[in-house]
Amino acid sequence: MGSAALEILGLVLCLVGWVGLILACGLPMWQVTAFLDHNIVTAQTTWKGLWMSCVVQSTGHMQCKVYDSVLALSPEVQAARALTVGAVLLALVALFVTLAGAQCTTCVAPGPAKARVALTGGALYALCGLLALVPLCWFANIVVREFYDPTVPMSQKYELGAALYIGWAASALLMCGGGLVCCGAWVCTGRPDFSFPVKYSASRRPTATGDYDKKNYV
């Protein structure tokens, strides 16, 4: 596979991972708990995310409430907000940097400098994946630890939500895509010019007398 194809494939993976990271950041399903009371009519499921919590009744009715106070949130939620939003914004910067250094664009003159720009964009994407992985694993560790804690009531035990799995998949795509972009750019760092070759045909000049060569006539 050519270096340009590697860059394009890596950029596509990074874009999909970026969308998945935004989705994981906004979904209120980082922690999910399902419990049943003695009366099945009161069965409900509670979802908790970074920005709101939702309660889904057995009848299908869902009620969500946005967190009112930032200071009242737990430290892991505040840190997860900062790291996840930072990763999303950094991925946006990485997108522009990668597009500027990609071989299929003309934002930067072809050469080793252009390859280094693309290499920087791929490294930023990989950093985004690692940055998003920190709050995801931190949250998962807290949920699992509290789930097996005998002192926590059964009604307050949570399980891993779908947003965590989406975030893990997005982080993997960002790191893999960033690695592919770096591989495609690394191949071109030693080339003086890696732009697509364009062949030009030489124009025919007239003779000194202004007349065309006689052999052009039949």
From Swiss-Prot:
Disulfide bond annotation, renumbered to this chain: none
Membrane topology: Multi-pass membrane protein
Pfam families (UniProt xref): PMP22_Claudin (PF00822)
UniProt keyword annotation of Transmembrane helix present: yes
Chain residue ranges for the region called Interactions with TJP1, TJP2 and TJP3: 217-218
GO molecular function: structural molecule activity
Predominant localisation class: other
Superkingdom of the source species: Eukaryota
GO cellular component: bicellular tight junction; plasma membrane
Entry's family note: Belongs to the claudin family.
Function: Plays a major role in tight junction-specific obliteration of the intercellular space.
Protein name, per record: Claudin-5
